[in-house]
């Protein structure tokens, strides 16, 4: 498989985290409806929220349905430095309970050297135009995320908004229902974020605008069911799902989180395909979808620092049915760090995230090993720096990234002919988190 094809079939989720029944929305239907749907939703929200805010209920809702005091939503996961709106909109949806409405709207511009075939040297794009609807409390809970997006990732082609939304996870990328009989135990099902890895799927969920090299070896969003159980200081999750959005329910994954204190935590996560599946699409890379993988993520979070070292191992077993005639593995490590200036600083609102990564693959083409990076046996390192500013719901950030690959297979690396071994990008993203 050519490198461009493999990289098109990119996967952390984003979660760092991991069954709707049915297939993804088709690209053509999605392309024609994304922006119309967003406009209709915006108009509908305006019509609903105005009377909802003006009207006071004469009856006290049931205790489990009573809206909580305004606070930032914890879904989608946003580990920083960007933070969610602390005063989210909400309205009473009757039998559906109190519904919180938040979202992300952001364009970006990108410049790169050594672009892949079909890619552009410079471009502008909508990176997010999404609404989030959720009921996060009570016995019955739900979350629905709708809209358009892109998923920029290091060392891969950039796909515009229409193609990314249509060919990855559709205009409804995440949606699930959850039953939580106790605070410690819950069951959920739908389109879920992966449990594996340290980075999440969408730009606003991460320290950096672009996802990293390690993220590209992990699932991002899966259809499936998940059990969650908390027994302080431990939290467990177990999922049966379709892995890399394959619509083949042959994956099992799980995670265990140990919270030492409010500043330190450790997450061990693993998953894999217990069968061999031959599906290959943009969202479902053939070899990665037939892999097993393990990640170990430690996080230290104490202002002004957040530091996350991260280890990853993956293995694709030999299977002639998918073209892997010998097995191959990847070994990777990363450090994600962020420094945020305090409120008493003249640079209040500014943060400086940085990411270092190294990823190595095994095998060789002569023995029929699968290509997991830039040819069998190749390796790569990256650095990403993303100065960020946020004021209330507004944010702006600029990003420099550089990827350098070694032991590449000619034709499977960077540039129009796949012969270059480095790629540098500059990205700027701005928007609102309402």
What are these regions (language model features)?
Residues 88-253, 257-266, 342-344, 351-353, ...:
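Outer membrane beta-barrel
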Residues 56-59, 64-65, 145, 199, ...:
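Acidic-residue sensor for enzyme active/binding pockets
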Residues 84, 126, 172, 332, ...:
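Short, conserved clusters of charged catalytic residues that mark active-site
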Residues 28-29, 73-78, 117-118, 161-167, ...:
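Outer-membrane beta-barrel pore domains
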Residues 14, 23-113, 434:
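N-terminal periplasmic/intermembrane-space "pro-region" immediately following the signal or transit peptide
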Residues 9-15, 43, 63, 364, ...:
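Extended rod-forming repeat segments used as scaffolds/tethers
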Residues 3-8, 12-26:
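Short, Lys/Arg-enriched N-terminal segments with co-localized hydrophobic residues
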Residues 2-3, 60:
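Low-complexity, intrinsically disordered or signal/transmembrane-proximal segments
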